[in-house]
């Protein structure tokens, strides 16, 4: 199971970095966690952001703000990646 999670983490990491997201940010960490959970078939798909907030002991609005900020930063840096 850990090998599978490590493989997913690597794939998600490569994808997020190819989109210009920075691994050192909280938004990246939150997105990485949420995507790995979804790829593993979490039963909480409709509440993945709430689950992410609970996992990181953060308020939901803080998690969403960090994710939006990181995606916006990546878009401003290179909008072509999102075409």
Model regions: which residues?
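Basic, alpha-helical nucleic-acid-binding regions used in initiation and control of genome expression
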Residues: 4-26, 33-35, 40-83
